[in-house]
Amino acid sequence: MLERIKVCFTESIQTQIAAAEALPDAISRAAMTLVHSLLNGNKILCCGNGTSAANAQHFAASMINRFETERPSLPAIALNTDNVVLTAIANDRLHDEVYAKQVRALGHAGDVLLAISTRGNSRDIVKAVEAAVTRDMTIVALTGYDGGELAGLLGPQDVEIRIPSHHSARIQEMHMLTVNCLCDLIDNTLFLHQDD
Protein backbone atom coordinates (compact mmCIF):
# COMPACT_ATOMS: atom_id res chain seq x y z
CA MET A 1 0.00 0.00 0.00
CA LEU A 2 2.79 2.44 0.85
CA GLU A 3 4.39 1.82 -2.54
CA ARG A 4 1.08 2.53 -4.28
CA ILE A 5 0.84 5.87 -2.46
CA LYS A 6 4.31 6.78 -3.72
CA VAL A 7 3.25 5.82 -7.26
CA CYS A 8 0.24 8.15 -7.06
CA PHE A 9 2.39 11.06 -5.90
CA THR A 10 5.09 10.32 -8.49
CA GLU A 11 2.57 10.17 -11.34
CA SER A 12 1.05 13.45 -10.21
CA ILE A 13 4.42 15.16 -9.99
CA GLN A 14 5.45 13.85 -13.42
CA THR A 15 2.20 15.10 -14.94
CA GLN A 16 2.72 18.51 -13.34
CA ILE A 17 6.24 18.72 -14.76
CA ALA A 18 5.03 17.76 -18.25
CA ALA A 19 2.18 20.27 -18.01
CA ALA A 20 4.51 23.02 -16.76
CA GLU A 21 6.59 22.54 -19.91
CA ALA A 22 3.73 22.16 -22.39
CA LEU A 23 0.93 24.46 -21.20
CA PRO A 24 2.10 27.95 -20.16
CA ASP A 25 1.29 29.53 -23.55
CA ALA A 26 -2.20 28.00 -23.66
CA ILE A 27 -2.92 28.96 -20.04
CA SER A 28 -1.71 32.51 -20.69
CA ARG A 29 -3.89 32.79 -23.81
CA ALA A 30 -6.87 31.43 -21.90
CA ALA A 31 -6.35 33.89 -19.05
CA MET A 32 -6.14 36.82 -21.47
CA THR A 33 -9.27 35.59 -23.27
CA LEU A 34 -11.13 35.58 -19.96
CA VAL A 35 -9.72 38.97 -18.92
CA HIS A 36 -10.70 40.62 -22.22
CA SER A 37 -14.21 39.24 -21.93
CA LEU A 38 -14.57 40.56 -18.39
CA LEU A 39 -13.11 43.96 -19.30
CA ASN A 40 -15.69 44.23 -22.08
CA GLY A 41 -18.52 43.73 -19.61
CA ASN A 42 -19.16 40.10 -20.48
CA LYS A 43 -19.41 36.97 -18.34
CA ILE A 44 -18.02 33.47 -18.10
CA LEU A 45 -20.26 30.40 -18.22
CA CYS A 46 -18.68 27.19 -16.90
CA CYS A 47 -19.65 23.54 -17.19
CA GLY A 48 -18.38 20.05 -16.54
CA ASN A 49 -19.49 16.65 -15.24
CA GLY A 50 -18.44 14.92 -12.02
CA THR A 51 -15.03 16.20 -10.90
CA SER A 52 -15.07 18.58 -13.87
CA ALA A 53 -18.34 20.03 -12.53
CA ALA A 54 -16.60 20.62 -9.20
CA ASN A 55 -13.77 22.41 -11.02
CA ALA A 56 -16.28 24.54 -12.94
CA GLN A 57 -18.06 25.42 -9.72
CA HIS A 58 -14.75 26.23 -8.00
CA PHE A 59 -13.86 28.62 -10.84
CA ALA A 60 -17.23 30.40 -10.69
CA ALA A 61 -17.07 30.68 -6.90
CA SER A 62 -13.55 32.12 -7.10
CA MET A 63 -14.75 34.72 -9.61
CA ILE A 64 -17.87 35.74 -7.71
CA ASN A 65 -16.38 35.71 -4.22
CA ARG A 66 -12.61 35.95 -4.54
CA PHE A 67 -9.60 33.78 -5.19
CA GLU A 68 -6.80 34.81 -2.81
CA THR A 69 -7.21 38.58 -2.71
CA GLU A 70 -10.21 40.70 -1.77
CA ARG A 71 -11.56 42.36 -4.91
CA PRO A 72 -14.87 43.15 -6.60
CA SER A 73 -16.97 40.21 -7.77
CA LEU A 74 -16.60 39.05 -11.36
CA PRO A 75 -19.49 37.59 -13.40
CA ALA A 76 -19.28 33.82 -13.74
CA ILE A 77 -21.99 31.17 -13.69
CA ALA A 78 -21.45 27.44 -13.11
CA LEU A 79 -24.17 25.83 -15.21
CA ASN A 80 -24.06 22.61 -13.18
CA THR A 81 -25.35 24.11 -9.92
CA ASP A 82 -29.09 24.60 -10.53
CA ASN A 83 -30.56 21.17 -9.85
CA VAL A 84 -34.08 22.27 -10.78
CA VAL A 85 -32.97 23.43 -14.24
CA LEU A 86 -30.75 20.39 -14.78
CA THR A 87 -33.40 17.88 -13.80
CA ALA A 88 -36.17 19.67 -15.70
CA ILE A 89 -34.15 19.46 -18.90
CA ALA A 90 -33.00 15.89 -18.25
CA ASN A 91 -36.54 14.84 -17.33
CA ASP A 92 -37.62 15.73 -20.86
CA ARG A 93 -35.07 13.14 -22.09
CA LEU A 94 -32.71 15.89 -23.10
CA HIS A 95 -29.73 15.01 -20.91
CA ASP A 96 -27.33 15.93 -23.71
CA GLU A 97 -28.89 19.42 -23.70
CA VAL A 98 -28.58 20.23 -19.98
CA TYR A 99 -25.83 22.78 -20.61
CA ALA A 100 -26.59 23.74 -24.22
CA LYS A 101 -30.07 25.03 -23.32
CA GLN A 102 -28.56 27.19 -20.59
CA VAL A 103 -25.85 28.48 -22.93
CA ARG A 104 -28.48 29.45 -25.50
CA ALA A 105 -30.53 31.21 -22.80
CA LEU A 106 -27.72 32.96 -20.92
CA GLY A 107 -24.82 33.28 -23.36
CA HIS A 108 -24.19 36.34 -25.51
CA ALA A 109 -21.57 37.40 -28.02
CA GLY A 110 -18.38 38.21 -26.17
CA ASP A 111 -19.06 35.84 -23.28
CA VAL A 112 -16.73 32.89 -22.70
CA LEU A 113 -17.67 29.25 -22.12
CA LEU A 114 -15.21 27.45 -19.86
CA ALA A 115 -15.85 23.81 -20.82
CA ILE A 116 -14.12 21.15 -18.73
CA SER A 117 -14.04 17.53 -19.89
CA THR A 118 -11.42 14.93 -18.99
CA ARG A 119 -11.66 13.08 -22.31
CA GLY A 120 -13.38 15.78 -24.39
CA ASN A 121 -16.21 13.47 -25.43
CA SER A 122 -19.02 14.16 -22.94
CA ARG A 123 -22.10 14.73 -25.10
CA ASP A 124 -23.55 17.46 -22.90
CA ILE A 125 -20.26 19.39 -22.93
CA VAL A 126 -19.89 18.97 -26.69
CA LYS A 127 -23.45 20.25 -27.17
CA ALA A 128 -22.70 23.21 -24.88
CA VAL A 129 -19.70 24.13 -27.04
CA GLU A 130 -21.81 23.85 -30.19
CA ALA A 131 -24.40 26.15 -28.59
CA ALA A 132 -21.69 28.63 -27.57
CA VAL A 133 -20.48 28.78 -31.17
CA THR A 134 -24.00 29.74 -32.32
CA ARG A 135 -24.01 32.53 -29.70
CA ASP A 136 -20.66 33.94 -30.92
CA MET A 137 -19.00 33.05 -27.64
CA THR A 138 -15.35 32.16 -27.21
CA ILE A 139 -14.50 28.77 -25.74
CA VAL A 140 -11.77 27.89 -23.27
CA ALA A 141 -11.63 24.09 -23.07
CA LEU A 142 -9.80 22.08 -20.42
CA THR A 143 -9.28 18.55 -21.73
CA GLY A 144 -6.96 15.56 -21.55
CA TYR A 145 -6.19 12.40 -23.51
CA ASP A 146 -6.38 13.42 -27.21
CA GLY A 147 -8.85 16.28 -26.64
CA GLY A 148 -11.71 14.19 -27.98
CA GLU A 149 -14.58 15.56 -30.03
CA LEU A 150 -14.37 18.83 -28.12
CA ALA A 151 -10.96 19.69 -29.58
CA GLY A 152 -12.32 19.41 -33.12
CA LEU A 153 -15.03 22.00 -32.45
CA LEU A 154 -12.66 24.79 -31.47
CA GLY A 155 -11.92 27.70 -33.76
CA PRO A 156 -8.80 29.88 -33.99
CA GLN A 157 -10.12 32.32 -31.37
CA ASP A 158 -10.71 29.50 -28.87
CA VAL A 159 -8.16 28.01 -26.47
CA GLU A 160 -7.66 24.37 -25.56
CA ILE A 161 -5.64 23.52 -22.48
CA ARG A 162 -4.99 19.80 -22.98
CA ILE A 163 -3.34 18.09 -20.05
CA PRO A 164 -0.55 15.81 -21.36
CA SER A 165 -1.85 12.63 -19.75
CA HIS A 166 -4.01 9.57 -20.41
CA HIS A 167 -4.84 9.03 -16.74
CA SER A 168 -8.16 10.54 -15.63
CA ALA A 169 -7.17 11.22 -12.02
CA ARG A 170 -3.99 13.06 -13.06
CA ILE A 171 -5.92 15.08 -15.66
CA GLN A 172 -8.51 16.11 -13.09
CA GLU A 173 -5.79 17.12 -10.63
CA MET A 174 -4.18 19.26 -13.30
CA HIS A 175 -7.53 20.78 -14.26
CA MET A 176 -7.86 22.01 -10.66
CA LEU A 177 -4.34 23.45 -10.75
CA THR A 178 -5.09 25.07 -14.12
CA VAL A 179 -8.30 26.62 -12.76
CA ASN A 180 -6.29 28.02 -9.86
CA CYS A 181 -3.69 29.41 -12.31
CA LEU A 182 -6.44 31.07 -14.35
CA CYS A 183 -7.97 32.63 -11.24
CA ASP A 184 -4.56 33.89 -10.13
CA LEU A 185 -3.77 35.34 -13.57
CA ILE A 186 -7.16 37.05 -13.82
CA ASP A 187 -6.77 38.64 -10.38
CA ASN A 188 -3.16 39.58 -11.07
CA THR A 189 -4.01 41.18 -14.42
CA LEU A 190 -7.18 42.99 -13.43
CA PHE A 191 -6.34 44.11 -9.92
CA LEU A 192 -2.65 43.83 -9.10
CA HIS A 193 -1.27 44.92 -12.49
CA GLN A 194 1.81 42.76 -12.09
CA ASP A 195 3.32 40.96 -15.04
CA ASP A 196 5.60 38.20 -13.84
UniProtKB/Swiss-Prot annotation:
GO terms for molecular function: carbohydrate derivative binding. SUPFAM superfamilies: SIS domain (SSF53697). Pfam families: SIS_2. CDD domains: SIS_GmhA (cd05006). The keyword Protein biosynthesis does not apply. GO terms for biological process: carbohydrate derivative metabolic process; DNA replication. The keyword Isomerase does not apply. Residues 34-196 form the SIS domain. Keywords: DNA replication. Required for the timely initiation of chromosomal replication via direct interactions with the DnaA initiator protein. HAMAP family: SIS_DiaA (MF_01157). Homotetramer; dimer of dimers. Belongs to the SIS family. DiaA subfamily. This is DnaA initiator-associating protein DiaA. It comes from Salmonella paratyphi A (strain AKU_12601). The lineage of its organism: Bacteria, Pseudomonadati, Pseudomonadota, Gammaproteobacteria, Enterobacterales. The gene is diaA.
